């Protein structure tokens, strides 16, 4: 049985977040938390919070054993993009894209 947790509208691009998500896919939760704790990426903090939420959901709602959990699925989808304007020289302007993402983490028990 899989238990999931989601973080929607995270203020980070999906491309940057997927770099960290790919590292923890399939790992036991203890190793995944350890890897995320010592990572220097901003995405690692966000994914670690979602992973801790999924672990808490599994333990509290379904009574699963925390020691036997592993990260079965983790994926990052693009959220809405805010478009902003930045003034440049000689009356020109550039568009700034403020990207967001939706992070989903699923954990399951190993048999």
Swiss-Prot record:
Protein name: Large ribosomal subunit protein uL22
Keyword check for Phosphoprotein: no
The organism of origin for this protein: Francisella philomiragia subsp. philomiragia (strain ATCC 25017 / CCUG 19701 / FSC 153 / O#319-036)
PROSITE patterns reported in the protein's UniProt record: RIBOSOMAL_L22
GO cellular component: cytosolic large ribosomal subunit
Keyword Hydrolase (UniProt): no
GO molecular-function terms, A-Z: rRNA binding; structural constituent of ribosome
Keywords from the named record: Ribonucleoprotein, Ribosomal protein, RNA-binding, rRNA-binding
Family classification: Belongs to the universal ribosomal protein uL22 family.
Superkingdom to which the source organism belongs: Bacteria
Biological process terms in GO annotation: translation
Biological function: This protein binds specifically to 23S rRNA; its binding is stimulated by other ribosomal proteins, e.g. L4, L17, and L20. It is important during the early stages of 50S assembly. It makes multiple contacts with different domains of the 23S rRNA in the assembled 50S subunit and ribosome. The globular domain of the protein is located near the polypeptide exit tunnel on the outside of the subunit, while an extended beta-hairpin is found that lines the wall of the exit tunnel in the center of the 70S ribosome.
Subunit structure: Part of the 50S ribosomal subunit.
């Amino acid at each position: 049985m899989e238990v999931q947790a989601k973080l929607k509208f995270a203020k980070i691009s999906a491309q940057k977040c997927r770099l960290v998500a790919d590292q923890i896919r399939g790992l036991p939760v203890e190793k995944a938390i350890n890897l995320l704790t010592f990572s220097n990426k901003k995405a690692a903090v966000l994914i670690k919070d979602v992973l801790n939420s999924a672990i808490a959901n599994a333990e509290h709602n379904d009574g699963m054993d925390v020691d036997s959990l592993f990260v079965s699925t983790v994926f990052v989808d693009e959220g809405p993009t805010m478009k902003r304007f930045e003034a440049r020289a000689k009356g020109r302007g550039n568009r700034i894209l403020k990207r967001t993402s939706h992070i989903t983490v699923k954990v399951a028990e190993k048999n």
